[in-house]
Amino acid sequence: AIVEICQRIENGHYLDQFPLHVWQTGSGTQTNMNANEVISMLGNEYAKENILHPNDTVNASQSSNDTFPAALHIMVAQKINAELLPQLDLMIHQIKKLEEENEGIIKIGRTHLQDATPLYFSQELSGYRSMIEHSKAQIIDSLKYVYELACGATAVGTGINCPEGFDEVVTKIISEKTHLPFV
């Protein structure tokens, strides 16, 4: 019942059940509990029996302190891999193409508010390309931190009331579903 209702919510159903504003506490407890209560209520209706509880079954082994940072990390990692990195690759490719097309064209360099020494336009473009390539490398390097998910630590980071190995199981499933190396 939980999976069915979550898939329906993911597909845009029941959005009227989520009236909370974006501005709330840092941990997102209001949104997390709202989601747990909605999933529990709708799941019980779907199952035609009262088997789900917002805390004990829907929110089992989780905390807003886990779920919100983990959700943000998942979203950021997906957006970086699916959108940002391909766009940076396209930008690098286009600048490289411009470098080749403008090989041999001389222009005046600028420093502060005055003319400086001459340089090839392709040299100037290669500087822009290099900055983007370095920025891309730094973004890729920083992903190792984004791939770290806060799962199973529960409310204060001790993992109390969370089954042993829960974090590993959850990150493995998330990695399989997203095709990203979460840990």
Language model features with spans:
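Conserved, well-structured ligand/cofactor-binding cores
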Residues: A1-V183
